[in-house]
């Protein structure tokens, strides 16, 4: 039986990490379509949690609920609770600007803004904070360093971000997301449009970033989930089937559906 090789534990302490994000009895509807069904999940702080499952299972939908990006579109409704540090972000009283600063997101395809590299990173900061020129320069440099991009762009910050390679653009998007110093970083298949070398660099970056951020990553690549995550959640047809430590999910899953998926029997 084919199984995914899971790397040795990546230095995470054995003690239970504090819960950063928790979904409680979460349902989601696309108009009348019931896309997520009673999801209950706890996302540990400063760990990487991977969401896996076949296309259409609800993993990207769940990710988008964590920052309420669905609220930009009509006829979409979430019911239940999503707690960030114990506060329900689905409450109408929870400020959207606050949520956007606390939960960053990087999408499947790099989406640099049509402006300079510097302004791409500074853009979000300007909307949330008033910094001096020197402080802004320091913040942009720090974000680009966290995005593992500084050494490649430090001499061309005034050039268009559209001239960067695909892998560089995605790291720029990560730098732009962390520039606001969020608590949580959401990654929606961040390497699916990249070559193997760029993919490897992003995976290394994820490992580095979890020292400072709680990370949730959606991936169709089970080998990637095994490499980068501390915890893995398997979803199927809008249900959360199983959620456990990654080494457990890939070596001793408790549910037959999980076993069938990771061994390639369906998906």
UniProtKB/Swiss-Prot annotation:
Pfam families: ABC_tran. Its main location: membrane. InterPro entries: AAA+_ATPase, ABC_transporter-like_ATP-bd, ABC_transporter-like_CS, P-loop_NTPase, PstB-like. It is found in: Cell inner membrane. SMART domains: AAA. Keywords: ATP-binding, Cell inner membrane, Cell membrane, Membrane, Nucleotide-binding, Phosphate transport, Translocase, Transport. GO terms for cellular component: plasma membrane. This is Phosphate import ATP-binding protein PstB. The gene is pstB.
